[in-house]
Amino acid sequence: MAKKNEETLRCSFCGKSQKEVKKLIAGNGVYICDECVSLCNEILEEERFEHLEGIKQDLPTPQEIHKFLNDYVIGQERAKKILSVAVYNHYKRIFKGTSSDEIQKSNIMLIGPTGTGKTLLAQTLAKFLDVPFAIADATTLTEAGYVGEDVENILLKLLQNANFDIQRAQIGIIYIDEIDKISRKSDSPSITRDVSGEGVQQALLKIVEGTLANIPPQGGRKHPQQEYIQLDTTNILFICGGAFVGLEEIIKKRIGKRTIGFLSETKKIDEENVLSQAEPEDLIKYGMIPEFVGRFPVVATLNQLDEDALIEILTKPKNALVKQYQKLFSIDGVKLTFTDDALRAIAKKAIERKTGARALRSILEDIMLDVMYLIPSERGINECIINEDVVNKKASPILIYKEKKVKHA
């Protein structure tokens, strides 16, 4: 009789019999099968990400991410490809419900000279994915208890940018700039306190690897009595960037030791692309602690920008500087034209300043100041032409009036 009753037990939700399912869990007069339990878990998981504006359903592919980056970032093709794959894998890991124990988080280290687009890449990724984004400067950070910013303040910035929506903040992106500036003074462990170097790396470790952090909503040091907000950093993507001046020499030294007898043949290749051959041991030699390096499995290097790349940056991206100035002039009814030799002269000046694309805006502001001061008050101007002589301060911008009159500003 007991056997007969056992055979007729059915799931109270789907009606399947005990024989049709793997497990049948009994409650007080009700039963639920393993299939219905799985379905309930899926529904709960969907509700968990409902407020994240469809990013789970519409997670872009690496190619789609790369294509969007191309609209705003010129060159750096390999870095863009590495970032696209890493970001895709990171969010796939979150939204496909994979256990964090199975797949390591794809935190990213960007290595490259000043003005090569490290910050822009991180900003553009966050914009495309529509996730909260925060930028921090590693040079302002110190260990807790010392003058400076606590590492938890980075998380506070992210939380503020997410309008204190904890769930959104927990899938955000944090970019830490100047990370090379917190390298320890030597590659051997220090017996003295290094509160802005190794100490900061140790403090960052906790939030980078994933922890339940206590965030002071008004900043940590001035309001010690406030209540804390808990933020899980497990699914926050950390991107660190730095110029790592001097890293090339460390890499060359390592490669030189390994290629004795072949050095003359490989030297040219090494010189052209040294940073791309960076290994974790090089970063450790530079002064990053092994545990910190280990938390950034993805390393992308960015190349110094040449004249052609800088000209493209001036003209091609959706938010290119030349396009911005042309839009400003068009509001006053004036067409703004930059000649090819003017663009090349601007690129040369930027290279001379050794700050990459970062120099372009200040150079343009200097060139355009006088004419932007004049045009709103001057009637009848149809076109403004900027040529090489204008860039090099040998002439004023050429103004063409509607009655075909030409005048220098």
UniProtKB/Swiss-Prot annotation:
UniProt gene name: clpX
Organism of derivation: Thermodesulfovibrio yellowstonii (strain ATCC 51303 / DSM 11347 / YP87)
PROSITE patterns given in the database record: CLPX_ZB (PS51902)
Protein name listed in UniProt: ATP-dependent Clp protease ATP-binding subunit ClpX
Quaternary data: Component of the ClpX-ClpP complex. Forms a hexameric ring that, in the presence of ATP, binds to fourteen ClpP subunits assembled into a disk-like structure with a central cavity, resembling the structure of eukaryotic proteasomes.
Ranges annotated as spanning the membrane: none
Sites where the protein binds ATP: P113, T114, G115, T116, G117, K118, T119, L120
Role of this protein: ATP-dependent specificity component of the Clp protease. It directs the protease to specific substrates. Can perform chaperone functions in the absence of ClpP.
A molecular function (GO) term: protein dimerization activity
